[in-house]
Amino acid sequence: FCFMTYPIQLHGQSFQMHFSGALFWVEKSMLLISDVHLGKISHFRKYGAAVPQQAIQQNFDTLNTVVEFFKPKGITFMGDLFHSSLNSEWALFEEWVHSITSEIILVSGNHDIISPLKYENIHIKVISELVIDSFLLTHHPEERDGFFNFSGHIHPAIKLTGLGRQSVRLPCFYKTQSQMILPAFGEFTGIYTLEPCNGCEVFALLGDSVLPVPIKEVKRKPNTRK
């Protein structure tokens, strides 16, 4: 079975995984989104890459879709919101921020080099990590005793193999006992295939669906370095 959203319980809290790659925390009415990489498409186009102009708008259309679906009180971007320095997409982002009512927090990532003052001017709080109850929200995956960690950065994907050795790699939510790595939300962000570990749970994104993936027993843990 596959679904537009897929529910999961973590530390007694309810979450909904969305096919866009966003994760909704029900009790907090908070949307978690990682690795949008706004500005990346404009950056590529500037240097001659054949990326269609409409791809820029796609990121904002997807953001609008998921915000309208969940109507969150808060949105936490978990790093790499912007891919590089300021470009024309910043103005589009400002317009988008002013069009919604959700409170926005940015947990900064390695690509977030734009001055925090620019974010503060549009009422976005920039922090290095966010702790809420027994949950730790970071950009890079972290292990911290007593906490369940939500992170991004890896752009996780799973390789699915079918008949005739045909295979496909799909972005996914990747969950271990103490972590969940969110898929990259943005267009043209790339993916990094992880080898599932014993006890892991994987939820692949396929079109407008979230698909739970059965995991076979394996002997090695994934390399989550990138």
Give the positions of each predicted feature:
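Extended recognition/assembly regions associated with phosphoester-bond processing machinery
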Residues: 1-78, 82-226
